[in-house]
């Protein structure tokens, strides 16, 4: 969950994992999606009561491939196809990631523009930087699917522009 349900019971997070796994199979064509539980460590006993209880439910036979806990630093590394979390924690991860990406691109741009060599390097790598930045651009994604409801619902970011809304409609 990326923010729709901020107070969740462990069984709901398991349901989010089921829906996320089904979405990855049917929409993203991932044959056997791996599901991780977002937590503060990879060990089964890590985390708060909610995380530990959710882990206990997820390690029971489920209709998805549970790979254990996943730390926030691994969220973008592809360690899991689906990362299950309550909406509060998922939204904090999402917004922190957006902020860090924005900060890093700003630092790189500022650093490159400080010298003639940097400006030349930026010019030579312009297309590469543009492609990398585009791969992290939430505008191009449009929004996140709201699973478990009847019909196609895409939740767009609160600060979405016209392009993001267009992409959200296209995604639906």
Could you describe each region identified by the protein language model?
Residues 79-83, 87-172:
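Glycine-rich phosphate/nucleotide-binding loop
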Residues 1-3, 60-70, 107-122:
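Short, acidic/small-residue loops that bind anionic groups at enzyme active sites
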Residues 1, 38, 155:
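Residues in well-ordered beta-strands of folded domains
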Residues 6, 39-44, 70-74, 86-89, ...:
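Glycine-rich beta-alpha junction loops
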Residues 7-72, 81:
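Glycine-rich phosphate/diphosphate-binding loop of Rossmann-like nucleotide-binding domains
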């Amino acid at each position: 969950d990326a923010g729709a349900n901020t107070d969740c019971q462990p069984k709901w997070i398991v349901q989010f994992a089921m829906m996320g796994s089904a979405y990855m199979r049917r929409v993203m064509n991932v044959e056997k999606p791996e599901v991780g539980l977002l937590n503060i460590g990879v060990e089964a006993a890590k985390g708060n009561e909610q995380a530990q209880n959710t882990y206990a439910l997820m390690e029971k036979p489920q209709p998805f491939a549970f790979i254990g806990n996943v730390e926030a630093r691994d969220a973008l590394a592809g360690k899991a196809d689906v990362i299950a979390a309550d909406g509060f924690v998922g939204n904090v991860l999402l917004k922190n990631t957006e902020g860090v990406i924005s900060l890093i691109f700003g630092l790189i741009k500022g650093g490159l523009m400080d010298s003639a060599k940097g400006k030349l390097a930026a010019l030579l790598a312009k297309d590469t930087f543009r492609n990398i930045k585009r791969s992290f651009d939430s505008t191009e994604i449009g929004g996140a699917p709201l699973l478990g409801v009847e019909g196609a619902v895409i939740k767009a970011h609160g600060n979405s522009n016209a392009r993001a809304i267009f992409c959200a409609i296209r995604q639906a």
